[in-house]
């Protein structure tokens, strides 16, 4: 398969995933934040860690976090050892939202590949990225 065709297929996958991310309730950035805070260890659930993970500014990350807090998906808690720092955790509403995460469409598609295909795909994508 020519490189251009492969690149077009990757672009199409990206568009499909992006389109799935707009569910009318949360934006793709907000979905990414929910996934991050659900997986991160308690000491990494900070605005700075999320900004670094997203490779964005702290201001942009904070806007996403504030929207999720306002929507009742995240709650902010001060660290017991340092009251100036905060840890963010998912609320029950945030956990319920993740149960219907549109990203799972892609996860299921990749899961439909056999182990050899998934390994080859992962290696190829690592090389591309």
What is the predicted function of each stretch?
Residues 10-13, 17-20, 54, 97, ...:
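Alpha-helical linker/hinge and terminal dimerization helices associated
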Residues 66-119, 123:
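Charged, amphipathic alpha-helical coiled-coil/dimerization segments
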Residues 1-28, 71, 90:
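N-terminal leader segment of winged-helix/HTH proteins
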Residues 7-11, 119-126:
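Amphipathic alpha-helical segments that line or abut small-molecule/effector binding pockets
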Residues 5, 12, 32-36, 96:
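Pre-recognition alpha-helix immediately N-terminal to the DNA-recognition helix
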Residues 15-57:
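N-terminal helix-turn-helix DNA-binding core of bacterial DNA-binding proteins
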Residues 47, 65-66:
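Short, hydrophobic-biased segments on the C-terminal half of alpha helices
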């Amino acid at each position: 398969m020519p490189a251009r065709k492969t690149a077009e297929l990757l672009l199409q996958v990206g568009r499909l995933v992006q389109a799935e991310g707009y569910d009318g309730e949360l934006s793709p950035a907000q979905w990414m934040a929910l996934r991050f805070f659900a997986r991160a260890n308690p000491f990494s659930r900070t605005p700075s860690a999320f900004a670094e993970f997203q490779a964005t500014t702290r201001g942009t990350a904070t806007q996403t976090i504030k929207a999720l807090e306002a929507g009742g998906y995240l709650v902010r808690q001060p660290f017991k050892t340092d009251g100036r720092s905060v840890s963010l955790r998912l609320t029950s509403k945030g956990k319920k939202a993740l149960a219907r995460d549109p990203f799972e469409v892609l996860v299921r598609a990749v899961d439909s590949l056999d182990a050899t295909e998934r390994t080859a795909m992962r290696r190829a994508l690592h090389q591309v990225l």
